[in-house]
């Protein structure tokens, strides 16, 4: 077993060696390096064929038509393109958008930008387990609502939203439904031929593909229209201009092909490892599970350890690569906005750790992590006067601290 142990697969994944090997064949003069938009010679044709194969691989994993897959630079761009693109195209019908407070920043900040442009956004508060109350969602839908954007799996707590039912609700009212599926693709079955989803964002690097590549699914029947956000040569059927990065697309396609083959066995293995990790931690005093295991993704475990500072715990766990909050916002010391939206107090939100497991995680690593966390929590609490007061029966929430 090599240290440090990587348990931050929700932040990014290493490229699968099969993916890296395949990508190498699309870079140099000896490989297929052409521009897929070059229609006048075989270098271009071969590159175009490689892109087509990758597009098919992605479509097969998610049950769509390959022509519905638009390549982007990542899920952040896909979220931006979906939300801004749909809002701009359908704004004559209305200017009201619905999303949730626990969405990824790529969705929330895109919605904030649209608010500055005159759109109205309703940010729903989820239930304490992270799930959206479907009755509450129905209650905020209006005649001028044009778009609902709800993620499939939350990147911090792993909760799985009922996108099937939400899709039916949106469909019945003629509202466009966008889903950020960055964390779910390859871990949960997605069948866009059955789901009433109009737009869906995907990433390459959360599923053992390369960084810098993603895709947006745009439904063809009934046709969904979006306004381009990147202008140029009209690539990707006019929705996203820019020369296609063949090596990255091939890498993403190969990653999705492998995921389709191995998903059923891998998901079971991950769920067993996640449950093993939780079973090893759950009898620590004052430990709280954020989210809900039975409604959660198989690879994410978010736990709060009361009376322990999250930052000091992460430092104590230097042999474990884990995160507090998401990587996108971990440069700030603010407690996780996702956990705050679930109603956790600052102390519990600050003491949360997200463990996310993946393809290369072993049972031995999970057992090592359990042992290390238990020892570290014990040691840090011994140093904590708050823990001592708690053990003496003092209710810390009632203490009035004097300002100085």
Curated annotation (Swiss-Prot):
Residues that coordinate or bind [2Fe-2S] cluster: 328
Position of the signal peptide: none
Catalytic activity: (sulfur carrier)-H + L-cysteine = (sulfur carrier)-SH + L-alanine
Main location group: cytoplasm
Gene3D superfamilies, per database record: Aspartate Aminotransferase, domain 1, Type I PLP-dependent aspartate aminotransferase-like (Major domain)
Modified residues (N6-(pyridoxal phosphate)lysine): 206
Keyword set, alphabetical order: 2Fe-2S, Cytoplasm, Iron, Iron-sulfur, Metal-binding, Pyridoxal phosphate, Transferase
Cellular component, GO annotation: L-cysteine desulfurase complex
Catalytic activity, EC: 2.8.1.7
Single GO biological process annotation from the record: [2Fe-2S] cluster assembly
Annotated PROSITE patterns: AA_TRANSFER_CLASS_5
One Pfam assignment: Aminotran_5
Cofactor(s) listed in the protein's UniProt record: pyridoxal 5'-phosphate
Subcellular location: Cytoplasm
Entry annotation: catalytic residues: 328
Binding site for pyridoxal 5'-phosphate: 75-76, 155, 183, 203-205, 243
InterPro entries attached to this UniProt entry: Aminotrans_V_dom, Aminotrans_V_PyrdxlP_BS, Cys_deSase_IscS, Cysteine_dSase, PyrdxlP-dep_Trfase, PyrdxlP-dep_Trfase_major, PyrdxlP-dep_Trfase_small
Biological pathway: Cofactor biosynthesis; iron-sulfur cluster biosynthesis
Enzyme class: transferase
UniProt-recorded Gene Ontology molecular function terms: 2 iron, 2 sulfur cluster binding; cysteine desulfurase activity; metal ion binding; pyridoxal phosphate binding
Described purpose of this protein according to its UniProt entry: Master enzyme that delivers sulfur to a number of partners involved in Fe-S cluster assembly, tRNA modification or cofactor biosynthesis. Catalyzes the removal of elemental sulfur atoms from cysteine to produce alanine. Functions as a sulfur delivery protein for Fe-S cluster synthesis onto IscU, an Fe-S scaffold assembly protein, as well as other S acceptor proteins.
NCBIfam families cross-referenced by the UniProt entry: IscS (TIGR02006), PRK14012.1 (NF010611)
Family (UniProt): Belongs to the class-V pyridoxal-phosphate-dependent aminotransferase family. NifS/IscS subfamily.
The protein's assembly and partners: Homodimer. Forms a heterotetramer with IscU, interacts with other sulfur acceptors.
HAMAP family from the UniProt entry: Cys_desulf_IscS
Protein name: Cysteine desulfurase IscS
């Amino acid at each position: 077993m090599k240290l440090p142990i990587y348990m931050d697969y929700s932040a990014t994944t290493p490229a699968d060696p099969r993916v890296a090997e395949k990508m190498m064949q699309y870079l140099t003069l000896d490989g297929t390096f052409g521009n897929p938009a070059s229609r006048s010679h075989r270098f271009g044709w071969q590159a175009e064929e490689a892109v087509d194969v990758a597009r098919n691989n992605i479509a097969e994993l998610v049950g769509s038509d390959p022509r519905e897959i638009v390549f982007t630079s990542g899920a952040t761009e896909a979220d931006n393109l979906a939300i801004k693109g749909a809002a701009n195209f359908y704004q004559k019908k209305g200017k009201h958008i619905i999303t949730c407070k626990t969405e990824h920043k790529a969705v929330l900040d895109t919605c904030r930008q649209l608010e500055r442009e005159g759109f109205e956004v309703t940010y729903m508060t989820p239930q304490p387990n992270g799930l959206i109350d479907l009755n509450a969602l129905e209650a905020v839908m209006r005649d001028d609502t044009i778009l609902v954007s709800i993620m499939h799996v939350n990147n911090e707590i792993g909760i799985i939203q009922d996108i099937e039912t939400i899709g039916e609700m949106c469909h019945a009212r003629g509202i466009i439904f966008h889903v950020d599926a960055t964390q779910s693709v390859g871990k949960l079955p997605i069948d866009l031929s059955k789901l009433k989803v109009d737009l869906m964002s995907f990433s390459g690097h959360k599923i053992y593909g390369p960084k810098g590549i993603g895709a947006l699914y745009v439904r063809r029947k009934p046709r969904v229209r979006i306004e381009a956000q990147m202008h140029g040569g009209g690539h990707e059927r006019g929705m996203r201009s820019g020369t296609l990065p063949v090596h990255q697309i091939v890498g993403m396609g190969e990653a999705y092909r492998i995921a389709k083959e191995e998903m059923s066995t891998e998901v079971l293995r991950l769920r067993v490892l996640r449950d093993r990790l939780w079973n090893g931690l759950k009898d620590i005093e004052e430990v709280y599970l954020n989210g809900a295991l039975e409604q959660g993704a198989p690879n994410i475990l978010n736990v709060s350890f009361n009376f322990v500072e999250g930052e000091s715990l992460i430092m104590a766990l230097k042999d474990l690569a884990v995160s507090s909050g998401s990587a996108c916002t971990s440069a700030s010391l603010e407690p996780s906005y996702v956990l705050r939206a679930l109603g956790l107090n600052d102390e519990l939100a600050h003491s949360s750790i997200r463990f996310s497991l993946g393809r290369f995680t072993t049972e031995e690593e999970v057992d090592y992590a359990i042992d290390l966390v238990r020892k570290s929590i014990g040691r840090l609490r011994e140093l904590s006067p708050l823990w001592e007061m708690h053990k003496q029966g003092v209710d810390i929430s009632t203490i009035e601290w004097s300002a100085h």
